[in-house]
């Protein structure tokens, strides 16, 4: 009886671990809103952003279309990072963070700077908007 119970518990543990993995794998497509954690290009393809990690921080690396690094910045801790999103008609880049909220980085002369006065366009949907927060 103990052996059967042990086997059943092992099967249940494997099932739970597989279920959790499937949920995690689907998170970017279903829970990030307009934001992504994947490589993403500006509206015209002139720039693309790619995220890496350094210590406990997320690093946003911005490259030109010919793969030259243009600018790099660290917007938030990796544990709070929920993705980035380009605006549809500019090079403004929005960062979604669990502790800082949604922040805009505007570009001037290929330098992206935090713009606390920026107004998020309606078409950029936060994961928090979708959750009703």
Identify the residue ranges that each predicted region occupies.
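Sec-dependent N-terminal signal peptides of Gram-positive bacterial secreted proteins and lipoproteins
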Residues: 4-24
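N-terminal export/targeting and maturation segments
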Residues: 20-76
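Short beta-strand elements that form the blades of beta-propeller/WD-repeat-like
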Residues: 45-53, 89-102
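Short, exposed beta-strand-loop hairpins at the edges of beta-sheets
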Residues: 95, 100-110, 114-115
């Amino acid at each position: 009886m103990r052996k059967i119970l042990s086997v059943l518990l092992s099967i249940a543990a494997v099932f739970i671990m597989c279920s959790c993995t499937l949920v995690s794998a689907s998170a970017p497509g279903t829970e990030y809103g307009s934001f992504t954690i994947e490589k993403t290009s500006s509206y015209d393809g002139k720039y693309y952003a790619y995220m890496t990690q350094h210590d406990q921080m997320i690093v946003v690396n911005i490259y030109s279309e010919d793969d030259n690094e243009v600018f790099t910045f660290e917007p938030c801790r990796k544990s709070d990072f929920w993705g980035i999103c380009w605006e549809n008609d500019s090079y403004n880049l929005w960062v979604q963070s669990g502790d800082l909220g949604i922040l805009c980085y505007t570009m001037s002369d290929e330098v992206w700077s935090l713009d606390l006065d920026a107004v998020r366009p309606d078409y950029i949907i936060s994961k928090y908007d979708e959750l009703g927060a």
